[in-house]
Amino acid sequence: IIAGLSGSGGLVNITANRLRMLGDDLKVLAAGYDQVLIDLGAGVEQTVQNLTRSAGQVIVVVTDEPTPLTDAYAFIKVTQTEIPGMGFQVVANIVNSMREGERTYNTLLKACEAFLKISPPLLGIIRRDAKVPEAIRSQTSILTRSPNSEAACDVEKIAKKLLIPGIRS
């Protein structure tokens, strides 16, 4: 996982040549792994779209708040327009229950079906877990710090789906 730095703005003013070089370097890096996940953060900026072009699949992570739902829909809409045929999957994050996660996903799904005529599948749901802020504060993965927590179990289910196509865990 290559995580974006929150609020850094480091990619905003990157030149086209440097962006191309970054994309090439990521492809070299990816060759040594089963999957590479890049956290681009929310947004529809050209830099995010250019990096998205090299992806085989896009995972859209959304919470049940209005702004993230709107941002997720906007990202899918712009990406679908600029990169026809791109596959999307959705993860409902920081939800209080599986039912709330399904409700969050269905809100986004209904908008995508009504206006974009696509139905991105639900990849998984990650429940709100008090262990996550602890892991963040210690700069440790939730899977390392609290491997038996609800959030860690949810992340593992998603990882299995990504690594083993067709799994329904």
Predicted segments, located by residue:
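G-domain G4 guanine-recognition motif of GTPases
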Residues: 63, 88-102, 124-132
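P-loop/Walker-type NTP enzyme "switch/lid" segment
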Residues: 1-31, 136-138
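NTP-binding/hydrolysis catalytic cores, primarily Walker-type P-loop NTPases
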Residues: 137-169
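Conserved beta-strand segments of the P-loop GTPase G domain that flank and frequently precede/overlap
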Residues: 3-4, 38-39, 60-63, 90-93
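Inter-motif core of Ras-like GTPase G domains
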Residues: 25-35, 45-67
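Beta-strand-loop-alpha "switch" segments that mediate conformational coupling across diverse proteins
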Residues: 115-143, 155
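Conserved C-terminal guanine-recognition region of P-loop GTPase G domains, centered on the G4
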Residues: 69-88
